[in-house]
Structures are given as C-alpha cells and as structure tokens.
Curated annotation (Swiss-Prot):
The keyword Manganese does not apply. This is Acetyl-coenzyme A synthetase. The lineage of its organism: Bacteria, Pseudomonadati, Pseudomonadota, Alphaproteobacteria, Hyphomicrobiales. GO terms for biological process: acetyl-CoA biosynthetic process from acetate. It holds the Pfam family AMP-binding_C. CDD domains: ACS. GO terms for molecular function: acetate-CoA ligase activity; AMP binding; ATP binding; metal ion binding. GO terms for cellular component: cytosol. CoA binds at R190, G191, G192, R193, T309, S521, R582. Mg(2+) binds at V535, H537, V540. InterPro entries: Ac_CoA_lig, ACAS_N, AMP-bd_C, AMP-bd_C_sf, AMP-binding_CS, AMP-dep_synth/lig_dom, ANL_N_sf. It comes from the Bacteria. Belongs to the ATP-dependent AMP-binding enzyme family.
Length: 645
C-alpha cells in the first residue's frame, strides 16, 4: 500500500462541482434520504412523464427486485441528442479519430440527430420495434454510436459484441438474445491491420441458423465481402433512402436499454441487463462529477464501445451532458508509441480516461515519447478496468499529467452500470492505488468469509449494502442465475466478487478478484499486492501473479514478468526480483517461480487473462477454456512452450 497522500490543490478545487465539505453533506443525504436525494437528481434528465416513485428495491434473496423512477417515461436518445439541439446544435458531439492519424471527423449534435433518425427509420423498415434486440458488431467508428442511439430511439434493445470477438463468441451472443438484425462492417482497421468483421458475422449466423433475418453492413475498408441477397444490406444505401426525422418512442424507466454479455467464470456468458431511466441518470451524473466535466471541454475515454466503459463513458454519459466525446479507432502504439499524446494535442483533450494496462505498457517505453508532446490541455486523468499499481499511478501523475492533473482511479463493473467508488477532483485527497471513496448513494461494506460486516481498517470481500440507480436489473432470461451469482453469497447484499482493504481514513483499496487470492501456507495474499511490488522495480514493465499447486505450501506464487524495453532476462535478475518482493511485502510473498515473458495474454480491452495464466502455471495446457477474446493468441503459445521446458 502506498503511504503517499496528494492533497486537493487550490487549482483543482477552485471551480470544481464539489469540495470535501459538499461531498460529505451530499453523500450523507444520499444514503440517509435516498428518495429525496434521487428524487431531485433524477431530474437531471428530461422526462416525458415525470416519475412519482423513486426507489423500490429489495436485495432479499427470495425477492431480488430493483426498480428506480419506475412510473417515469423518457427516451435515452432524445436526452442524448434532441434536448441539446436548440443550444448546442452546431457544437461537436463526437470527434472521431481513425486508426490512420490522417483520418478524423467532427460530428455536430445536428448531424448526430440526422444520422440517428435515418438509421432508426431503417431499423423500423426491417421490422424492428420496441423490445426487439439488435446485435451491433462494429469497429470504433461513429456508426457504432449511431446504432446504439437509433436502437434507443425506437425502444429496441442493443447487444454490442466487441469487434475483436470471434465468430463463435458472436454466434453465442446472437443466440443468447435472439437478434433478428445485426449491424456490422465489411472490415475494421486496428494498428494498421484489417480486422475481418463480415466474414465473422457470416460464420456466426450460419451457426445460429434461422435467427438473423437482416444484416446491415457499413463500408469501412471497401474490402471485398461475400453477399447474401435478401439478407444483406449496405448501410449507406439504406440510409440514403430514409427520412432524417424519427419520433422517439416513449419508454418506461424500467424498460431495458441494452444487454451486454460478460464472461462468467464458469459456463456461458452472462447477459447483463441495464435499464433506461436509472442507468442514464447515473451515467450522466457520474460523468459530470467524477471527471468534473465542464461545458465545452473535450473528453476522451479510450475504451471500446464493446465494453461497458464505452457504453457509459463514451456514448451515454457524455452525450446526455452535451459533451464533446472522442472516439478512437486505433491502438496506443500505432503508428508510434506517442499516439495517445499526439491525439491529446491534436484535439486539445481536457479529460483523459484509460486503463492501467495501457498506462503500464506506455510506461515501459520510457518518458521520452510522452515528453515529446505538449499535453498542456489535460486537466483530469482517469483510470479504469482493474486496480492501478502505485508505481504506474505515480508515472501517470508525474510524467503524463506533469503533477497538475488529479487522477480519478475509478472502480466499477459491467454489472454496476457506472462508477461506484472514485475520487472527486475537487473533494478527495488522492492515494496512489486507492479508488478512495464511494460515489453518492453507494454503500460499500467489507465482510469476512462468514459474512460479518467489518468495521474500521480491515480486509475482506467487498459488498454493496443497498441499490443505486444504474445497477443491473437481471441477467437476460435468467433471473435465477442473477440472484445466485450476486445475492446468495452474502444474503441481503450485492456481492462484487472483489477483495478489498479499507484503511484508517476510510479509503477503499481493491485487491483484485476474490478468485485472484493465493493461499500460501494458510496466508491469504491478494495477487494485486504482489504484482504492484514487482512493477515497482525499475526493470519491470508489467507483472501478473497466479497461484499454482505447491507440495509444501498448498499454493506457490508464480510470477509472469515483462521487462522494460532493453532489459534482458537473467538468473541474477530473477533472484533480485524474488528478494525485492521478499523485502517489500515479506517472505510469505516471495515468488516461487519467476517466468520472464515477452508479453502477457490480454483481452482486446487490455485485461490480463489470469485464468489462462493459472492453467499454464498448473501445466494444464489442454484446459485453457475460451481463448476467443485474446488480442494476440501467439503470446499464449510462447508461454506454454517456455513452461513446458
């Protein structure tokens, strides 16, 4: 745990929405009088028919039910577009930056309105109506946002499948929500390479025969694609014939807005269902307060819309707030390792939100590529996706933000809909590696294995004691699995699946997934702690730690280590790293095996696939499970070869 504290500076607090005192009073009223608090803040979005009921929720395992603003009627698309037209019609809604640095475009709110309405009318012409599901399988191009908002406009439920997923994964997700229509592209671009999309979509549809009736295809690369007459439609040709005006469907607050399939640790992917009203209130409010977003600023979240971060913090939250949001098709390392910072300068980005894995890989390339750019417009930096180790936090703060930008280290999940624990720039003193304090209305608790709520400084499992507006409502067509997965371990509480430590200041430190705990000779060790220690070593760029069967200790510690550019692995360095961790955490945390790895297996969103690393450490090479989400499968082959020898 880092013992450094960075107090709120006068610069951060002078025009922030909340300071420490206001946070305290708002938080207290949000948990003591939720109906009053959310009754007021629910009005931040426009309602066709205002709600009279605010909160109606139960975490009782026999009757899990979550309803917010349940008698209100609204539309997400009009909240993200139409309500801004009178005052912000000519303002840029979306800045799109292509994979190729020479390709970018600005889309105003007026243009966004026209594109979304045309696509909504096309969807209707192909028989899509309120309650139908539409699968979106697109690269990071503006059409992905248009498709989401067009579905929302007519009350269709979208299910986005990340463009890096295989035909098998796509087919399973189409079958999971029975989409009659899919929107895809001929191909995508990523890091200078073409990514097959229509080929995968064709293969997926074959696997789930009889479900998909229509495939709308965006021309992205102009590459040759197979064509099925009567089913396949070119996006541009269909839109050219459609009206640029489409009335918005009146949606109940509790109508589903989207389904997002997330991998279960076992079994089929889970279709997380998010609502309309509560979700949008939360996405817009967290976007404003957590990033301290101010009108006219340029906001960039580097995620993909295929992940929940892209849903909430590229599209819905920012656009509901009338923001200018940046969509990036490329990768941080193409054409050069300074790409992120070049984009920041090119588009004068004020708020930048990315993942620890990207920060660590950029840190591995040294300070030079960052310092070659200006970044003077940056005001707030954010981190999302996994706990950020203090070493990477410090680098991000010192080198990228030049010690003038607060870092909001945000903790949340696909299931939570939006940020639950995070600093607020004008209110929260920062501790590198800590997600700090809960957002309004969020009641975290730390419990022990028996479910006892722990007070004061402690370590245990993180649960949330009561509901918040953006909480997932159910798993698609499987409410029983929803109750089982999230409410049965600690009855009456939402179980996050994450381990957590709370310090003497009441700050929360996420220690990683509960299944990422190693039991060494009866001592429970969070893998995140050992990883942070390794990454703090000057020669280490990235580390992933897993447990493996050990004759004496029960479990041993297996550390995969990627070294900084230019550093060669050696037996001396291996010993040095073992003693480094031993000195930093204690003998109990000393790695038993240090495996120098040129790369780690990651999903396209940058998460390290520890499940695969565990299997390799255990030498269970034939039981790796689903590897379709890997960004670079060759990494796994290399690791297996090295482990086998």
């Amino acid at each position: 745990m880092s013992d450094k504290v960075y107090p709120v500076t006068a610069e951060w607090s002078k025009s922030a929405y909340v300071d420490a005192a206001k946070y305290k009073s708002m938080y207290e009223s949000s948990v003591s009088e939720p109906d009053k608090f959310w009754g007021e803040h629910g009005k931040r979005i426009d309602w066709v028919k205002p709600y009279t009921k605010v909160k109606n929720t139960s975490f009782d395992p026999h009757n899990v039910s979550i309803k917010w603003f349940e008698d209100g009627v609204t539309n997400v698309s009009t909240n993200c577009i139409d309500r801004h037209l009178a005052t912000l019609g000519d303002q840029t809604a979306i800045i799109w930056e292509g994979d190729d640095p020479n390709e970018s475009k600005h889309i105003t709110y007026k243009q966004l309105h026209e594109e979304v309405c045309r696509l909504a009318n096309v969807l209707k012409s192909y028989g899509i109506s309120k309650g139908d599901t539409v699968t979106i399988y697109l690269p990071m191009i503006p059409e992905a946002a248009y498709a989401m908002l067009a579905c929302a406009r007519i009350g269709a439920i979208h299910s986005i499948v990340f463009g890096g997923f295989s035909a098998d994964s796509l087919g399973g997700r189409i079958e999971g929500c029975k989409s009659k229509l899919i929107i895809t592209a001929d191909e995508g671009y990523r890091g200078g390479r073409k990514v097959p999309l229509k080929v995968n979509a064709d293969a997926a549809i074959k696997k789930v025969d009889g479900i998909v009736e229509t495939m709308i295809v965006v021309r992205r690369t102009g590459g040759k694609v197979a064509w099925t007459e009567g089913r396949d439609v070119w996006y541009d040709e269909a839109l050219a014939k459609a009206s640029p005006d489409c009335p918005a469907a009146e949606m109940n607050a509790e109508d589903p807005l989207f389904i997002l399939f997330t991998s279960g640790s076992t079994g089929a992917p889970k279709g997380v269902v998010h609502s309309t009203g509560g979700y949008l209130v939360w996405a817009s409010m967290t976007h404003q307060y957590v990033f301290d977003y101010r009108p006219g600023e340029v906001y960039w979240c580097t995620a993909d819309v295929g992940w929940v971060t892209g849903h909430s913090y590229i599209v819905y939250g920012p656009l509901a707030n009338g923001a200018t949001t940046l969509m990036f098709e490329g990768v941080p390392s193409y054409p050069t390792i300074s790409r992120f910072w070049d984009v920041v300068d090119k588009h004068q980005v004020n708020i930048f939100y990315t993942a620890p894995t990207a920060i660590r890989s950029l840190m591995g390339a040294g300070d030079g590529p960052v310092k070659a750019t200006s970044r003077k417009t940056l005001r707030v930096l954010g981190s999302v996706g996994e706990p950020i180790n203090p070493e990477a936090w410090e680098w991000y703060y010192r080198v990228v933000g030049e010690e003038r930008c607060p870092i909001v280290d945000t903790w949340w999940q696909t299931e939570t809909g939006g940020i639950l624990i995070s600093p607020l720039p004008g209110a929260t003193a920062l501790k590198p590696g800590s997600a700090t304090q809960p957002f309004f209305g969020v009641q975290p608790q730390v419990v022990d294995a028996a479910g006892e709520v722990l007070e004061g400084p402690c370590s245990g499992n993180l649960v949330i004691a009561d509901s918040w507006p953006a909480q997932m409502r159910t798993l698609f067509n499987d409410h029983e699995r929803f109750v089982q997965a999230y409410f049965s371990a600690y009855p009456g509480k939402y179980f996050t699946g994450d381990g957590c430590r709370r310090d003497e200041d009441g700050y929360y430190w996420i220690t990683g997934r509960v299944d990422d705990v190693i039991n060494v000779s009866g001592h429970r060790l969070g893998t995140a702690e050992v990883e942070s220690s390794l990454v703090a070593h000057i020669k280490v760029a990235e580390a992933a730690v897993v447990g493996y069967p050990h004759d004496l200790k029960g479990q041993g510690i297996y550390a995969y280590v990627t070294l900084m550019t230019g550093i060669e692995p050696s037996e001396e360095l291996r010993k040095e790293l073992v003693s480094w961790v031993r000195k930093d955490i204690g003998p109990i945390a000393s790695p038993d095996i240090v495996h120098f790895a040129p790369g780690l297996p990651k999903t396209r969103s940058g998460k390290i696939m520890r499940r695969i690393l565990r299997k390799i450490a255990e030498k269970e090479f034939s039981a790796l499970g689903d590897t379709s989400t890997l960004a670079d499968p060759s990494v796994v082959d290399d690791l297996i070869r090295e482990r086998a020898n």
